[in-house]
Regions:
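Solvent-exposed loop segments that connect transmembrane elements
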Residues: 185-191
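Extracytoplasmic loops and strand-loop junctions of Gram-negative outer membrane beta-barrel proteins
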Residues: 131, 193-195
Length: 211
């Protein structure tokens, strides 16, 4: 396809075939990116449009699907007239060959009506935003049976689960907070040239990047 490319953010190697896939963001921050499939010797096989700002790509263990975590960050900041793209996960079927790949993009729109519950479950969300916009997929891992994808939502301090049989987001779970006043959770907050671990009356947010 002809499009202005931005960052190449991630690559993955197929578990069985001599094929790699790369996630490529568009130059425009609010434009959809592509998953590009190449043979092991660099021959172009296909390119499939995915969501906005694909940040990570992986194959399922059975090799039948590829997935991208499309972060959809508001890279131009917040404010009037600024677009905050939806965060999504694209699921690609590669079972019919790497030159005949089809893609379906999974959104989090089903959670827009559950915003209050997400906040109660300690999912971090910006005020007055819909979860489908504010959730930002960062990284994906897939269960050994290739049935479920687990998606790190770093800025939201949460993990989403995607059912790969139905290609639906079925849960978003907050990871809670780390209490540094508890014994065993000591840290050093002081920039004084010394290393002195001690408890502090603060909480931390896990915010996982990889998973």
């Amino acid at each position: 396809p002809s499009f202005e490319y931005g960052d190449l953010t991630s690559i993955a190697v197929h578990p069985k075939e001599n094929v790699v896939v790369a996630s490529v963001q568009a130059k425009g921050y609010n434009d959809e990116g592509y998953a590009v499939f190449l043979s092991g010797d660099g021959k172009f096989l296909s390119a499939v449009k995915v969501g906005v700002q694909p940040d990570n790509v992986t194959f399922t263990p059975d090799g039948k699907k590829a997935l991208t975590a499309n972060e959809g960050e508001p890279r131009e900041g917040y404010g009037e007239g600024v677009v905050d793209p939806q965060g999504t996960v694209s699921v690609m079927d590669v079972s019919k060959g790497f030159q005949h790949v089809t893609a379906e993009t999974v959104t989090f729109e089903a959670f827009d009506s559950k915003r209050d519950q997400l906040v109660k479950d300690q999912v971090i969300l910006k005020k007055n935003t819909a979860p489908s916009v504010d959730l930002e997929p960062e990284y994906i891992t897939v269960s050994e049976d290739s049935r479920y994808a687990y998606v790190a939502l770093q800025e939201n301090n949460a993990i989403a689960t995607i059912d790969l049989t139905t290609n639906e987001a079925i849960s978003v779970k907050g990871l809670g907070f780390k209490d540094f006043s508890v014994k065993g959770n000591e840290l050093d907050l002081r920039k004084d040239g010394k290393v002195q671990l001690q408890n502090e009356n603060v909480n931390g947010i896990y915010m996982p990047d990889g998973i």
